[in-house]
Amino acid sequence: MFMDRWLFSTNHKDIGTLYLLFGAWAGMAGTALSLLIRAELGQPGALLGDDQIYNVIVTAHAFVMIFFMVMPIMIGGFGNWLVPLMIGAPDMAFPRMNNMSFWLLPPSFLLLLASSMVEAGAGTGWTVYPPLAGNLAHAGASVDLTIFSLHLAGVSSILGAINFITTIINMKPPAMSQYQTPLFVWSVLITAVLLLLSLPVLAAGITMLLTDRNLNTTFFDPAGGGDPILYQHLFWFFGHPEVYILILPGFGMISHIVTYYSGKKEPFGYMGMVWAMMSIGFLGFIVWAHHMFTVGMDVDTRAYFTSATMIIAIPTGVKVFSWLATLHGGNIKWSPAMLWALGFIFLFTVGGLTGIVLANSSLDIVLHDTYYVVAHFHYVLSMGAVFAIMGGFVHWFPLFSGYTLDNTWAKIHFTIMFVGVNMTFFPQHFLGLSGMPRRYSDYPDAYTTWNTVSSMGSFISLTAVMLMVFMIWEAFASKREVAAVELTTTNIEWLHGCPPPYHTFEEPTYVVLK
């Protein structure tokens, strides 16, 4: 029975739960790695050893957080749980493929961990640029294992994307048009399209790197007529859409949370929200070289990528102001989920502003590979994606489990986390503007103060993570049943009770849309 339910599962709710548990577990590993980084940087001088081990930790931290925490939780966890419920489908379109998508992730994670255990580990950074990732600078199997890990995670995501696209387009009730699906469903659909289009390019790039390392090809080796810049183009053509893949489902969740706790029956500017997400998805594919301003591009090329990157601020602004307009005039309920959503809007906007700074190629040439960039993307990820995940978790936890979290603890948790992440990442803007470079385990004494502050902040965040584990235990131990859910007609995922039955629909849904 246990094997049938959890190993061979074809139920979207169980697979969603598996994704959430796996993501939480990987998140702990990723957090541990980040604390090692901040412990090393807490003061000048060496703590862990040389720069190789430090860079192995940095690389693993990035891969674990992106591929094994944010993506499994947002797309696999919330996506699997909520999309079928929100469109009235009995399950996903391909339930067994859904199971395979999940079970490709633990072996992938295992390969990534193995890569750090053999030889010297993969100290390449998550970008895995040759020639550093080549077989001279990284002899041994480490980088090869990392590449295989990425292949598995990529196949998992591509299969999941096919599944979501098919489900969302094909399994709605006949009366429901695409423009009547909730915004979270839209966000997952657009994310899935981005995955489907970008991951094969990454697969091509890392496969060429694999053959360069092992089969004597020279795709990225000038000695044989290759070009390492080609790898950068292939990687970032995936890498930039990837960062939008990480944030788009969060946009969808924030729209639902803000609408719900403002007491509104729909978000402000539904169509604008949809078109904004589609625009962001499209533009995400034509700005990749802004990660490469320092490789020596023409001034015309730089001008194009600068302008195109800034254009993304427009649909993003549409979303931010629509969330604020949804709040306007509402009967606002200051629940923990609402606090996460408001924190998301504020901090994501701050991260977006530093992004506009970095979009200027002239400025980026100075700021590239400094802590300013680290501060920028951690504001949009560590306070964008993670805040969206936390908001979604405390909002939908009663739906998933049937129990309620303690409100006071949840608010305390938010406060500690808010202080922690800001104390960690705000000082990094100062470090970057002062020229402290990324990916080094040691630094001149002049940078000590802000690094110490940053490292203290990371330990405050650790306290918040531990408090969250306690909160979840407390909820399951206290067994407070869900009393009543408001607004069920506009939030149909709640319609079937908390938690919903194992099989939501025994027969196809019939929807009458006025």
From Swiss-Prot:
Record's cofactor remark: Binds 2 heme A groups non-covalently per subunit.
Membrane topology: Multi-pass membrane protein
Protein species of origin: Halichoerus grypus
Family matches, as Gene3D superfamilies: Cytochrome c oxidase-like, subunit I domain
Binding site residues for heme a3: 376
Annotated TM spans: 12-40, 51-86, 95-117, 141-170, 183-212, 228-261, 270-286, 299-327, 336-357, 371-400, 407-433, 447-478
GO molecular function, one term: metal ion binding
Mitochondrial intermembrane side: 41-50, 118-140, 213-227, 287-298, 358-370, 434-446
Residues involved in O2 binding: 244
Cross-linked sites for 1'-histidyl-3'-tyrosine (His-Tyr): 240-244
Binding site for Fe(II)-heme a: 61, 378
Pfam families reported in the protein's UniProt record: COX1
Described purpose of this protein according to its UniProt entry: Component of the cytochrome c oxidase, the last enzyme in the mitochondrial electron transport chain which drives oxidative phosphorylation. The respiratory chain contains 3 multisubunit complexes succinate dehydrogenase (complex II, CII), ubiquinol-cytochrome c oxidoreductase (cytochrome b-c1 complex, complex III, CIII) and cytochrome c oxidase (complex IV, CIV), that cooperate to transfer electrons derived from NADH and succinate to molecular oxygen, creating an electrochemical gradient over the inner membrane that drives transmembrane transport and the ATP synthase.
Annotated binding of Na(+), by residue: 40, 45, 441
Protein name: Cytochrome c oxidase subunit 1
Keyword Mitochondrion: yes
Quaternary data: Component of the cytochrome c oxidase (complex IV, CIV), a multisubunit enzyme composed of 14 subunits. The complex is composed of a catalytic core of 3 subunits MT-CO1, MT-CO2 and MT-CO3, encoded in the mitochondrial DNA, and 11 supernumerary subunits COX4I, COX5A, COX5B, COX6A, COX6B, COX6C, COX7A, COX7B, COX7C, COX8 and NDUFA4, which are encoded in the nuclear genome.
Domain of life the protein comes from: Eukaryota
Gene name of the encoded protein: MT-CO1
EC number: 7.1.1.9
